[in-house]
Amino acid sequence: MKTSIEAVSFRDMEQDCEFRFQKDYPFWHLYTDGHKADIIFSDNEDFKSGMNLLGVCCLRSPEVKVYTFVLMNNHLHMILSGASSKVIGLFDMFRLMLQRHFARSGRVVNLKDFKCQLIRIDSLQSLRNEIVYVNRNGFIVRPDCTPFSYPWGAGASFFNPCSKLRPSVTYDSL
């Protein structure tokens, strides 16, 4: 029995990835149109609130798996798996929580055009490409950031070499 990653061939790892892809299918790229929406997250406090609210929504949607995401000042991107109705439900909950948060803080934010679109991801290669696309968004828009440093998404977990030193955990195990 092979016990270390070095002993597993590339072909075996690819077969394992393909098996996991099929097991968790369907996958989705959820996004909102940044060309239509007004600014939502105007400062670090807004982004922190958005990150926390998105985390709460993910925890309240156990039937949806979130693989990566990025919050931008007027839109978001997420890669998820689960039934499309559950994925849309997670987004709708996030949008409602944002509305309530801003109403409590007295800030007027127009979320009329903050609507989600779904793109089905039908292959493992497409999933990989979409994950890279989502994680690149932050530092493409903000040249002062790198894949390691954009704070409002999961990109740092993908690109940070230090993340390999941390044990793999899920939110449920924390």
PLM features per residue range, with description:
Residues 1-73, 81-174:
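Short Pro-Cys-Gly-centered "Cys-loop" motif that presents a nucleophilic cysteine in a tight turn
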